[in-house]
C-alpha cells in the first residue's frame, strides 16, 4: 500500500551516504574565480547515481535532465532538473510544486582555519560538519532522498514535483550557466504552474523577505604631496571620508525605513556602509593623491536598485559641484586649492564605481497558496511559525519572481554557520525538513 506523502521520513543511512559523497567532492566545488572554478558535475554524478534506478529509462517514474548551459566553455558545470510527473501533466491546467536553488558549488574553505577537515563529512552526534552541509549540499541530499521516496511509493499526485539543482550560485563572475540561463532558455517554464520553493536558507523557518546588494568603490582624487605641505594639495584620505559621510547622510534620508518592513519583520532597514580600504602605496610622510573606500549597499525589496544608484550618483555630482562645502579637517585642509605663487591649483573630486550587477531583494507573496502551505506545515512540524526577513541576499531570486514565479524561501541548515569556518548542520533539522516538505506537498494537493 502506498504511504501517504505526509508520512515520509528521512532515510538516515541513505541521506548520510549521499551527503558524505557530496562533501567529499567539495575541494573541487569551491567557487572563487579565477583561482577556484568549481566542477559541479563531480557532485552531480552522485545525485544521478542515486536516482538512476528510479528513472523512466530504467523502468521507474522519474525524469531527469542534466543541463550544461555553456557546454563549450564549461562542459562539467551541469544543472540537474528532476521531475516526478503528476496526473495534471499534459492537461490544459498543469499543476506543479518545485524545489529550486539548492546548489552544487560551495564557498571556499581554508583548511588551516578549521578544527576539522572541511572536505570530509564528519558526524559528531547530531552535528554534521563539512563545507556545504548547511550551504547547500545538505539540501541537495535532502531533496534527492525525497524524490527517491516519491519514486518508491509512487503516489498519484495532481501536481508534478520538480527539483532543480543549480551551478554557480556562490559567485556571479561567470554568468549564463546557472539558474539565470535555465530561466532564459525556458527550461524552468513548467515551474510557473505552481509555487517555487527556493531551498537555500536556514533555521527551518520560512524566509519571507531578503535584501538587495550592490558593492561599490568610492574614490577621492587629489594630488600626491609631502606631508609637510598640506596647504598645497587636496588630501584624498580626508576627502573620501568626508564625502562618504555626506553620501551616507543623504542615503539615510532617501532610503529611510519603509512601512512594509515592519509587516515583513525585517531585522534591519536599508544600509550603506564602508567595509574595506583599498591599499594605498605611499609612506607616513606622503599625502596620497588617490584614496578608495569600498563597501556595500543593502536595500530592502521595497526600494528599486536602479533608482538607488541614480540617487547616489546624484549625491556625488552635487558634492563635486560644491566640493568646498564639505567639512574640512583644520585650517590647512582644503578640497579646492587655488593657484598662487609657486603653488599649482588642485581641485578635489570623488567618483563611484559600481561593481557588477546588483542583486535585488525579494518580498515573498504572503497571500499565496504556496506560502500558506509552507507556513502551516512548518507550524505543525516545529510547533510554531516565526517567518524571518533579512537583508542577506539570495542572488537571482528576484529575477525569478519578476519572471512570473511564485517564489517562497526556506532552508534547514544553521544560519550561524553560513560561509563560516567549521560549518555544520543538524541531522535532526533535516529529519524535520523532509516532514515539512512532504506535508507542504500534501496540503497543496488537498487545496
UniProtKB/Swiss-Prot annotation:
A GO term, aspect molecular function: acetylornithine deacetylase activity
Active-site residue list: 105, 169 (proton acceptor)
Reaction equations catalysed: N(2)-acetyl-L-ornithine + H2O = L-ornithine + acetate
Pfam families: M20_dimer (PF07687), Peptidase_M20 (PF01546)
GO cellular component, one term: extracellular matrix
Coiled-coil portions: none
Pathway participation: Amino-acid biosynthesis; L-arginine biosynthesis; L-ornithine from N(2)-acetyl-L-ornithine (linear): step 1/1
Binding-site residues, Zn(2+) 1: 103, 135
Keywords: Amino-acid biosynthesis, Arginine biosynthesis, Cobalt, Hydrolase, Metal-binding, Zinc
Positions contributing to Zn(2+) 2 binding: 135, 170, 419
InterPro entries from the UniProt entry: Bact_exopeptidase_dim_dom, Peptidase_M20, Peptidase_M20_dimer, Peptidase_M20A
Cofactor(s) this protein requires: Zn(2+); Co(2+)
TM helices/strands, residue ranges: none
Keyword Amino-acid biosynthesis: yes
Domain of life from the UniProt record: Eukaryota
EC number, as in UniProt: 3.5.1.16
Gene Ontology BP annotations: L-arginine biosynthetic process; ornithine biosynthetic process
Cofactor note: Binds 2 Zn(2+) or Co(2+) ions per subunit.
Enzyme class of the recorded protein, top EC level: hydrolase
Family as reported in the entry's similarity comment: Belongs to the peptidase M20A family. ArgE subfamily.
Assembly behavior: Homodimer.
Protein name per Swiss-Prot or TrEMBL: Acetylornithine deacetylase
Annotated source species: Dictyostelium discoideum (Social amoeba)
Amino acid at each position: 500500500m502506498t504511504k501517504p506523502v505526509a508520512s515520509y521520513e528521512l532515510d538516515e543511512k541513505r541521506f548520510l551516504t549521499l551527503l558524505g559523497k557530496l562533501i567529499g567532492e567539495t575541494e573541487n566545488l569551491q567557487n572563487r574565480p579565477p583561482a577556484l572554478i568549481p566542477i559541479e558535475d563531480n557532485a552531480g554524478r552522485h545525485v544521478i547515481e542515486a536516482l538512476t534506478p528510479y528513472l523512466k529509462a530504467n523502468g521507474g517514474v522519474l525524469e531527469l535532465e542534466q543541463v550544461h548551459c555553456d557546454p563549450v566553455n564549461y562542459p562539467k558545470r551541469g544543472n540537474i532538473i528532476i521531475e516526478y510527473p503528476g496526473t495534471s501533466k499534459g492537461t490544459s491546467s498543469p499543476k506543479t510544486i518545485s524545489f529550486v536553488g539548492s546548489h552544487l558549488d560551495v564557498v571556499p574553505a581554508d583548511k588551516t582555519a578549521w578544527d576539522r577537515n572541511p572536505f570530509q563529512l564528519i558526524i559528531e552526534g547530531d552535528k554534521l560538519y563539512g563545507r556545504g552541509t548547511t550551504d547547500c549540499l545538505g539540501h541537495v541530499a535532502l531533496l534527492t532522498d525525497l524524490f527517491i521516496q516519491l519514486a518508491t511509493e509512487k503516489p498519484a499526485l495532481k501536481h508534478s514535483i520538480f527539483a532543480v539543482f543549480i551551478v554557480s550560485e556562490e559567485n556571479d563572475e561567470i554568468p549564463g550557466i546557472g539558474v539565470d540561463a535555465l530561466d532564459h532558455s525556458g527550461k524552468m517554464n513548467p515551474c510557473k504552474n505552481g509555487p517555487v520553493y527556493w531551498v537555500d536558507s536556514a533555521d527551518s523557518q520560512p524566509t519571507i523577505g531578503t535584501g538587495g546588494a550592490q558593492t561599490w568603490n568610492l574614490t577621492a582624487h587629489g594630488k600626491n604631496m609631502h606631508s609637510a605641505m598640506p596647504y598645497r594639495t587636496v588630501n584624498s584620505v580626508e576627502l573620501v571620508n568626508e564625502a562618504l559621510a555626506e553620501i551616507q547622510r543623504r542615503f539615510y534620508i532617501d532610503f529611510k525605513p519603509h512601512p512594509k518592513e515592519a509587516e515583513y519583520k525585517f531585522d534591519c532597514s536599508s544600509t550603506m556602509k564602508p567595509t574595506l580600504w583599498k591599499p594605498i602605496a605611499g609612506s607616513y610622510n606622503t599625502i596620497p593623491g588617490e584614496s578608495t573606500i569600498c563597501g556595500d549597499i543593502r536595500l530592502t525589496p521595497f526600494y528599486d536598485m536602479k533608482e538607488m544608484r541614480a540617487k547616489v550618483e546624484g549625491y556625488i555630482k552635487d558634492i563635486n559641484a560644491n566640493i568646498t562645502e564639505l567639512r574640512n579637517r583644520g585650517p590647512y585642509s582644503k578640497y579646492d586649492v587655488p593657484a598662487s605663487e609657486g603653488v599649482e591649483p588642485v581641485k578635489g573630486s570623488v567618483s563611484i564605481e559600481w561593481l557588477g550587477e546588483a542583486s535585488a531583494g525579494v518580498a515573498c507573496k504572503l497571500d499565496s497558496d504556496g506560502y500558506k502551505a509552507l507556513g502551516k506545515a512548518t507550524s505543525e512540524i516545529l510547533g510554531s511559525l516565526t517567518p524571518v526577513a533579512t537583508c542577506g541576499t539570495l542572488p537571482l531570486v528576484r529575477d525569478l519572481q519578476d519572471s512570473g514565479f511564485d517564489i517562497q524561501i526556506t532552508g534547514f541548515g544553521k544560519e550561524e554557520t553560513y560561509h563560516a569556518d567549521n560549518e555544520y548542520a543538524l541531522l535532526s533539522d533535516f529529519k524535520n525538513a523532509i516532514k515539512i516538505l512532504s506535508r507542504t506537498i500534501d496540503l497543496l494537493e488537498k487545496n
